[in-house]
Amino acid sequence: MRTKAVIFTGVNKVEIGEVNIPKPGPTEVLVRTIITGISVGTDGWYIKGLYLGGQIRYPTIYGYQRVGLVEEIGSEVVTVNLGDRVFVGTARTRLEPGSRIGDAAGNYTGFGCHDASVIVAIPDGVSNIEASMGGVTATPVVGRNLTDPQQGELVLILGQGMIGQMAAQLYRDKGARVITADILANRVAISQKISADIAINSS
């Protein structure tokens, strides 16, 4: 099937085009996109040609935080049902043979075909916008789990952008005492209100 796509055609160059999405195989799911989260960091670097993962080959379709509805499921899929609202993280969208999208995940498309193992049903009470940020939570979750904070342990988090705020909240959730620092007053204010025990303006 043909679907619309946001295609990065070069550094700071974006076009709306179309790509072919295949029917799902036995273990795959076809997802109709509702929304995709945009990361100021990763997405911003990618469009500027500064992605840290290596050289970018254009044209390419980026996007790695798809929220959508299950439109079709393969014969062996048992984890989701038709109509389920789901999140798809960094998994690459499978395209028809010959549809080149470079090295990116390719979730800036109207539909995506993904293996069921990378699809998570979204619980009731979680909005589409909240769910679309699921991909960026991976960094602070991994960091918190690797450091295994103990109750009352003091933790310093430098930077209070989206990932820093999430990290602070995750550490506090484990019982750590959290100090945050940022050079932007608005981030410090938000951090003091919802993320940190102590928020410092380090400018």
Which residues does each predicted region cover?
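NAD(P)H dinucleotide-binding glycine-rich loop of Rossmann-like/cofactor-binding domains
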Residues: G89-L158
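Extreme N-terminal starter segment of soluble prokaryotic enzymes
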Residues: R2-K4
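Conserved hydrophobic/aromatic beta-strand scaffold that supports enzyme active sites
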Residues: I16-E18, V67-L69, R85-F87, F111-C113, ...
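Mid-domain Rossmann-like dinucleotide-binding core that forms the NAD(H)/NADP(H) cofactor-binding site
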Residues: S127-S203
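Cytochrome P450 core scaffold surrounding the K-helix E-X-X-R motif
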Residues: V40-K48
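Short coil/loop residues immediately preceding or within conserved phosphate-binding loops
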Residues: Q65, T109, G175
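Glycine-rich beta-strand-centered segment in the early N-terminal region that forms part
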Residues: P22-I38, L50-R92, P123-G125
